């Protein structure tokens, strides 16, 4: 019983610490009508593959799941696969984690489950991502020249 109580107290302390360390920015509400806007979803997939997937993997997502937003296997092959990837493979990067750490100071995280992991009392995971993507700003003090209000010192 004492171990259970100690574990509970430890968990509560950790949760409150994690809560305190969370974003102090008020999250914008993600416009829910965008979830049914197929063209916007397909454009987002293209932007993710062209820009984010160069450093960030989405290792728990397969390219063929993009059929869920109306893309065909042929469209995926023609527009989203650039090397030897196959439609049924997971979205991984060829970036060596050791090189990434050296170049960026940290290995870019896998983005597959960010929406689920960032849901909180402040908003949904979609709200977090929406706000995060909208709050980048120029910051000449950062190595990349950019910073973010939701995720300070990212990149």
Each predicted region: which residue ranges?
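Short, well-structured alpha-helical interface segments that form or flank functional binding sites
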Residues: 39, 43, 106, 124, ...
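C-type cytochrome heme c attachment motif
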Residues: 46-58, 97, 107-116, 128-131
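Short loop/turn segments at secondary-structure transitions that flank enzyme active sites
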Residues: 61, 117, 135
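Structured domain cores in non-transmembrane regions
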Residues: 66-110, 114
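Short, conserved charged micro-motifs
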Residues: 71, 120-126
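Extracytoplasmic/lumenal ectodomains and periplasmic regions of secretory and membrane proteins
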Residues: 125-155
């Amino acid at each position: 019983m004492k171990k259970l109580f100690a574990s509970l107290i430890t968990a509560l302390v950790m949760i409150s610490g994690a809560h305190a360390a969370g974003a102090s920015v008020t999250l914008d509400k993600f416009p829910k009508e965008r979830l049914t806007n197929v063209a916007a979803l397909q454009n987002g997939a293209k932007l993710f593959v062209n820009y984010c997937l160069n450093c960030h993997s989405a290792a728990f997502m397969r390219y063929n799941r993009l059929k869920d937003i109306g893309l065909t296997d042929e469209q995926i092959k023609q527009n989203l696969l650039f090397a030897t990837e196959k439609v049924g493979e997971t979205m991984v990067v060829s970036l060596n984690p050791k090189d990434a750490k050296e170049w960026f100071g940290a290995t870019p995280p896998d983005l597959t489950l960010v929406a689920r992991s960032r849901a909180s009392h402040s908003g949904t995971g979609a709200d977090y991502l929406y706000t995060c993507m909208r709050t980048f700003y120029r910051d000449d003090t950062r190595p990349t020249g950019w910073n973010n209000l939701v995720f300070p010192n990212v990149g």
